[in-house]
Amino acid sequence: FGPAQRLHGATYVVDATFRRPELDPDGLVVDIGRAEERLKVALAGLDMRNLDELDEFTGQNTTTEFLARVVFDRLRASIHEGALGEGARGLTGIRVTLHESHVAWASFEGEV
């Protein structure tokens, strides 16, 4: 991976896109307030940390792509736990994008 493999910091802008085939009865894709709250929960513990020191990431190359998948998995779990509300049960997919800069970003997306 070259010089990026050495210890370095990154500040990301994180976007989460929620997908469903039809709007819910309230005209929503997802309750944005709950989605924002759950995104904060998904990111908790990652800020200002050496990610290679976290037990859950032992042996992993903590790339931007890997982190996008971690956030995706956490948001998907929130949907299945009901933390995004009953309306979120109609969601069919999520895309998580981590922007390192205006020219470098990575996304992970999948079905829920």
Predicted regions and their residues:
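Charge-rich, low-complexity N-terminal segments
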Residues: 1-112
